[in-house]
Amino acid sequence: MSDNSVGIIGLTRQYPEFRYSTKEMIDVLGNKLTEKVKENILQLGVENRYFVRPLEHYVNKSSKQIKSVPDGEPISDLCKNVGEKCLSDLGLTKNDVTCIVAAFEDNDFLSPGLSSILLTKMGLSKFIPHYNIQGMACSTLPKLLELGKNLIRNKNDKVLFVISGCNSGWYLP
C-alpha cells in the first residue's frame, strides 16, 4: 500500500502447559551442563521457559536422550488455537485471511512447514499464500514484519502471523 498505513490490529498469545523456571531446568539437567553454559543461560535473562511436554519426557537419568513420541511435538495444535483465538478476538473469519506467515524454532515435523500444517488444521483455503520463517522467535520477528508489510497490497489484505517460541527437547543434552 502506498500510504504506509500498514499496522498490527491485534495480538494474542498462549503458552504451552509445562512451565519451568530457568533455575528448575538447570537443576533438572544437573551435571550435564558445564559451569560456563549455566552462567550463559542465567545471563540471558529468561526467567521461565515453556514446553509442550513435561521436561522429564526429554531427559532421563541415563545418558540416553529421549526422542519425541511418534505423534511429534503438538506445537501446531497450540499455534492453531492461538491463530483461531486471534481471528475471533478481531471479529474476523477464516475467509478474511489472505495470507499466513509462520515463524518458528521448532515444528511438529521437518516437513511440511508450520504454515502448511496450519492451513489444514485451521480450515483455511489451501490456495492462499503461506510462508515459513524458521529460527528463534526473537530473531525472526523483524523479518516476519518486513515480509508481512510487503505482502499487503490493499486495505482488504489480512495477513495472519503465527510466531511459535515453543521450546522442544530436541536440543537438550
Q: What kind of feature is each model-predicted range?
A:
Residues 11-13, 105, 164:
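Cofactor-binding loop segments of dinucleotide-utilizing enzymes, especially the Rossmann-like FAD-
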Residues 2-3, 88-94, 108-173:
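Acyl-thioester C-C bond-transforming condensing/cleaving domain
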Residues 67-79, 106, 110, 136, ...:
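Generic, well-ordered alpha-helical segments
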Residues 98-105, 132:
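Short glycine-rich or small-residue beta-strand-to-loop segments that form or flank ligand, phosphate
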Residues 2-98:
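Conserved active-site "lid/cap" helical segment
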